[in-house]
Amino acid sequence: LRVEKQAVSADGTALVRAGQEIEYTLRVVNVGSSTLRNAVVSDPMLGLQDAAVKPSTLAPGQSGELSVKHTLTQEEIDSLSVYNQASGTATPPRTDTPLEPGTAEVITGLSPPSSLLVAKRHEPLDPERASAAGDTITYYVDVTNNGTRTLVDVTVADPLIDDARHQVGDGT
């Protein structure tokens, strides 16, 4: 018995954000010389425990399969991959004892973009008078994460500002 597993984006696009779906196809292949019955797969991440493949009775060389979707979490996006393992078994003729489980694993690489948008602005100066040396100019630097990965320890450096104070927003 051989277990195979394949993962593809359910909508055919790159896997880049939480909420997208991966479609897993789990396949059990009879590589022996006897017909096997009750072919099932188990995959804890996908919530499968002894789920029957179709067909569940497999002649030599025949395979049965089952497809299941998994919705990506933000944690998976941030880790850049999803590791998943499945097992499968079937029962040979003239016994009620299933074969030792075969296993298959797949690591799905994710490609979320990391991107920051930085915008710098200042408070308007008094339009009634000319600017002079020593005037205080208040600058604002807005940093927005417009990618799909969670970013941590983001810092802003500006060589023109020597005593900058910062206020952290909501982190999104």
Place the predicted regions along the sequence by residue.
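Exported/extracytosolic protein signature
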Residues: 1-172
